[in-house]
Amino acid sequence: MTSSGAAAGLGLLSAATWGGSDFAGGWGARRASSLLITASGQILSLAGLLVICLALRLTIPGASYLVYAAIGGFEGAIALAVFYRALAMGAMGLTAALTGLMTALVPVVFDLIHSGWPTAITMLGLAIGLAAIWLISHSPAKEGAESPRRALFLGACAGVGFGAQLILFKTAAAGGVLWALTSARIAGVVAILLVVAMAPPKRPWRGFWIAGVVSGTLDAVGNLFYMLASQMGRLDVAAVISSMYPAGTILLAGIILREHPTKRQVAGIGLALAAVALLSA
């Protein structure tokens, strides 16, 4: 298998596990605060990462790698809170699509500047992949927006934050993936706890930690796959394929909750498969 094929495969695994994480978090959010679920997942997965790193006696990387990871974890958690706020304001379908597109577009632009232009086939795959992300992420939710323009602005800001996190994670992973994940998770826990402290959850649910464990674990595994993918190939390829994670959420919702995807989302999934084939070449 070529390095591009391996990177694409790891990117797909990242998208699948991130999609599962979002599904678990979304399911739990029907019963408890999404921030409470996120906080519990971050804390519990951090404990697991610390145990693994210490048990394996992994060498702690240089401070710069840990700092990059911590910045990515902190600003990614803040971006998540901003994204939740944007969705709550309305224009949910368009906001989610814009966030997904910006998440992939930021590392694509960064890598084009930093690494130069890829082959024509890769460029075509990236373009199709970005279109797929837009279609997959767009949901038919009722708009009823409190402030559509502000919701879209916050959604775009969240997407930029998520995209920046992908860039930072690639840099941090060069020093050691597991310690990078741990550093990012520590900073993420701090950020989420700050957000929860400023806006205490109103819907406690004794079983929220179950959704938190599943969501947090899958999110950490998805981060692991993404970091590995980013080390084996171009950043833009890893970022675009990994950003197709809403497809995994949609498929799980269809299988478990019997929720049918829209024609737009089905078309997006088809384009995503075509994009992956091109990016694996």
Feature locations, PLM:
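Membrane-interface interhelical linkers
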Residues: 1-17, 24-25, 29-71, 80-90, ...
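Hydrophobic transmembrane alpha-helices of multi-pass small-molecule transport proteins
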Residues: 49, 105-109, 118-139, 264-281
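Selected transmembrane alpha-helices and immediately adjacent juxtamembrane segments
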Residues: 148-179
